[in-house]
Every structure is written in structure tokens, then in C-alpha cells.
């Protein structure tokens, strides 16, 4: 709770008007979260994200008496719940915001919510939906043409998308992680404040393809961030950096026999610029890769190599700078007999790897991201990255990780 108050102070210094107490904080701290924020910020509008779906009157009363000015209920709740919540909001002098998160037909529902008399409707794409590539702007644009109720918007907004939200009709812009997870909360809030106040002065940036966005995110985050986002999974075992450097690319897979370097070298001609060649060679005592192959890979624009097996010509390979991750180095190689196959599913470092999976390597090792979940997991890794940046900032101020995260309180019992 102390961290939340400090973050709120820094956000206000950057220009934030309202303080939203999010659902996880309310669930962990109860109504005391609202009371604490009200005491700390007596002159600010306090928004309590209760996500009420039943007993609307009781939960609005609880939040109002704790100090909330605006209470959020789920827009998908039954009309009887919403009407009773409205009666309670009028009784206790607070405003009611209906949240459209996961509403089956949000455009139809917003018309009904306006007719019921709610004060605000929040066009909200949840965090898990954001990870799948959804954003609220298109929906907000459509809804703003149908109703006159005041519209709020939430869901992964930053300085860039906040501009689009204002232009699409939002009167309230709710920003979460892009402020609270920043290592400079005040500056992050200030940038968004400036975007909201002067939307025409901000140049809207866009990424041309999903693949490009995935690669840009993966270049920014670490393999540790990615493994955390995958619930501690995805990491190859026994694979270590030989030639250090960040590696991001899509997999071209090779299955071959001990020391047989025909298929690994042929894969260079099949791979495209930005691909990572992933090789399972079965034996760590005979090399299937060396200096000449590395030169060839550089000529094709290959992003890097992962080899469960051995590499040789280390003095030469290290000078070339191509990121290579392997399980061993030896001086001896085998012969190019041509056994094996290219671009079939393989197991490398204990991880299943399919052609097209995203492969990321750095100083910590290598992780495999299934292609079908690449966008989602890249976005989740970015959230882990932002959270850790915030923790680093708090540790730099003199705290310890255990104190900041209140580990004893949250140990599993």
C-alpha cells in the first residue's frame, strides 16, 4: 500500500487528475486502500474499480463511505444490479462508472447503460486481452458515435494511444502500467498529460507489421523477462553463449547426426535474413559448425545460431561477432554425409522447437517462444520488464527487494 501511495504522488506531480484504485489493490487491501488514498489525497478524485457484478447497492455504499468519488461496476451486470447501484450512488453522493470489459455486445450495451443513467461508461480492454493484441480505440470510436454519455477509456494506453483516445471521443483517459511500472513515474505521467492536452501536436507512431512489433519488443526485453512471462518456462537447458550478443529471430530447425555438418550448412541457404538456425546434433564431442559456416551465415543476414552439439574454430568464430549459443566447443569435426532434415519439429536444449518459433538469446541463455503465442508473450514480457524497471528504481532509492515486495506477507501458506 505504501508503494501505491508513493506512485500516486509521483503521478500527480506529472499531471494526473484522478487516482484509480485498481481491482487487485482493492482485493488485497480491501476498503482500507480507498481510505488510505483518500487520506493521502483529500483534494483528488478517487476512482474505486470495484468491478461489481452483484449486490450493487452494498458495494457502492462501501466504496463511498471509504472515500471514493467514482465507483466502477461491470457494465455486463444485470440491470437490477446497476439500477440499485445507481440508487446507492445518488444516496451517498458518488458517481457511477460502468465498465464494458468483456461485454458480449459492447455497442448495444452502451446504449442501454446510457438509458439506465450511469454517469460514465469505460471502454476497457483488459490486460489479458491486450496481450492478445486488442486495443480499445476502434471500439471507442464506434461507441462515441452512438451515445452522449461521458466516455472513459482504458487498456494499455501510452502517450501515443492516449492521443488517439482523445480524438476518438474519450473524456477520461485511464492509464495504468505505462505510468505505474515506469522507472520515472512523474515523467511518464507528464508525457501522457501533454499528449492529452495537445493531441494535435503529437505525431502518432505505428509499427508496420505484427512480426516487426514482436521483434522490436523482444529486442528490448531479456530472456529472463520472457521466461517469467511464460510462467518460468521456455528456457533451454545446457545451452550457453559462445559469442555474446542479443539474438532475436524466427527458427529454421535442423536435425542431424553426430558431427554431420551437411544439413546445418545447407540450412544457411534456406534461412532468410533475420532467422535463427537451431540445430540438434545429438553429440557434444564432434563439431557440426565452424568458422566457414559462420562466415556464410553472416553473408545471408542470419540473426544467430543455437546448437545442441559442438562448435569449433572458436578463435575465428569469436572475431566474426555472430551470436552463437552452444553446449560445447571442440577442435574436431565430422564429415558432410547429409543425414537428417531441415525445418521439422526438433528438441533442442530440452525445448520443443518448430520452424517459425521465435528464438531469443542473451547473456542468460536462450528461450523458445511458440509462434502461435509470440505476440501475446512478447507483450507479457514487456509488462514484466516495466515492472522490474520500477522495482530497480525503488531499490536505487535505498529499499531492498524483500521490503519493497513485502515478501513475508505474500509467502504461500
From Swiss-Prot:
Reactions listed under catalytic activity: D-ribulose 5-phosphate + formaldehyde = D-arabino-hex-3-ulose 6-phosphate
- Family per similarity comment: Belongs to the HPS/KGPDC family. HPS subfamily.
Species name for this entry? Methanosarcina barkeri (strain Fusaro / DSM 804)
Give this protein's Gene Ontology molecular function annotations. 3-dehydro-L-gulonate-6-phosphate decarboxylase activity; hexulose-6-phosphate synthase activity; orotidine-5'-phosphate decarboxylase activity
Q: Which function does this protein serve?
A: Catalyzes the condensation of ribulose 5-phosphate with formaldehyde to form 3-hexulose 6-phosphate.
Write out the entry's keywords from A to Z.
Carbohydrate metabolism, Lyase
Name of the molecule in the record:
3-hexulose-6-phosphate synthase
SUPFAM superfamilies named in the record: Ribulose-phoshate binding barrel (SSF51366), RraA-like (SSF89562)
Q: Does the keyword Lyase apply?
A: yes
Name its GO BP terms in alphabetical order.
Answer: 'de novo' pyrimidine nucleobase biosynthetic process; L-ascorbic acid catabolic process
Query: Which EC numbers characterise this protein's activity in its record?
Result: 4.1.2.43
**What InterPro entries does its record include?**
3-hexulose-6-phosphate_synth, Aldolase_TIM, Bifunct_HPS/DMK_prd, HPS/KGPDC, OMPdeCOase_dom, RibuloseP-bd_barrel, RraA/RraA-like, RraA/RraA-like_sf
| Gene3D superfamilies in alphabetical order | Aldolase class I, Ribonuclease E inhibitor RraA/RraA-like
Cell membrane keyword on record? no
Please give the Pfam families that the UniProt record associates with this protein.
Answer: OMPdecase (PF00215), RraA-like (PF03737)
Amino acid at each position: 500500500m505504501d508503494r501505491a501511495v508513493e506512485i500516486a504522488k509521483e503521478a500527480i506531480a506529472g499531471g494526473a487528475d484522478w487516482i484509480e484504485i485498481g481491482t487487485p489493490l482493492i482485493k488485497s487491501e480491501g476498503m482500507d486502500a480507498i481510505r488510505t488514498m483518500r487520506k493521502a489525497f483529500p483534494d483528488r478524485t478517487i476512482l474505486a474499480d470495484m468491478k461489481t457484478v452483484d449486490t450493487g447497492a452494498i458495494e457502492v455504499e462501501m466504496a463511498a463511505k471509504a472515500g471514493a468519488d467514482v465507483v466502477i461496476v461491470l457494465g455486463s451486470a444485470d440491470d437490477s444490479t446497476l439500477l440499485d447501484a445507481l440508487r446507492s450512488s445518488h444516496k451517498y453522493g458518488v458517481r457511477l462508472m460502468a465498465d464494458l470489459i468483456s461485454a458480449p455486445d459492447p455497442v448495444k450495451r452502451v446504449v442501454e447503460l446510457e438509458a439506465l443513467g450511469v454517469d460514465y461508461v469505460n471502454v476497457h480492454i483488459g490486460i489479458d486481452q491486450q496481450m492478445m493484441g486488442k486495443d480499445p480505440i476502434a471500439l471507442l470510436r464506434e461507441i462515441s458515435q452512438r451515445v452522449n454519455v461521458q466516455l472513459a477509456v482504458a487498456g494499455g494506453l501510452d502517450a501515443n494511444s492516449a492521443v488517439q483516445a482523445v480524438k476518438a471521443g474519450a473524456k477520461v483517459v485511464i492509464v495504468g502500467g505505462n505510468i505505474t511500472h515506469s522507472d520515472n513515474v512523474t515523467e511518464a505521467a507528464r508525457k501522457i498529460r501533454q499528449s492529452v492536452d495537445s493531441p494535435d501536436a503529437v505525431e502518432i507512431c505505428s509499427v508496420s507489421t505484427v512480426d516487426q512489433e514482436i521483434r522490436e519488443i523482444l529486442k528490448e526485453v531479456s530472456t529472463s523477462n520472457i521466461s517469467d512471462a511464460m510462467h518460468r518456462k521456455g528456457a533451454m537447458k545446457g545451452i550457453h553463449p559462445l559469442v555474446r550478443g542479443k539474438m532475436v529471430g524466427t527458427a529454421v530447425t535442423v536435425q542431424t547426426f553426430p558431427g554431420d555438418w551437411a544439413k546445418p550448412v545447407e540450412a544457411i541457404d534456406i534461412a532468410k535474413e533475420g532467422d535463427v538456425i537451431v540445430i540438434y546434433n545429438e553429440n557434444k564431442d564432434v563439431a557440426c559448425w565452424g568458422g566457414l559456416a559462420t562466415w556464410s551465415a553472416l553473408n545471408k543476414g542470419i540473426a544467430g545460431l543455437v546448437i545442441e552439439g559442438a562448435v569449433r574454430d572458436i578463435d575465428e568464430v569469436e572475431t566474426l561477432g555472430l551470436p552463437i549459443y552452444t553446449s560445447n566447443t571442440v577442435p574436431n569435426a565430422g564429415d558432410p554425409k547429409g543425414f537428417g532434415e531441415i525445418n521439422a519439429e526438433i528438441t533442442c536444449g530440452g525445448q520443443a522447437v518448430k520452424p517459425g518459433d521465435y528464438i531469443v538469446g542473451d547473456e542468460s541463455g536462450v528461450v523458445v517462444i511458440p509462434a502461435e503465442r509470440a505476440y501475446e508473450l512478447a507483450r507479457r514480457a514487456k509488462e514484466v520488464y516495466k515492472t522490474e524497471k520500477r522495482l530497480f528504481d525503488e531499490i536505487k532509492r535505498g529499499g531492498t527487494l524483500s521490503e519493497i515486495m513485502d515478501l513475508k506477507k505474500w509467502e504461500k501458506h
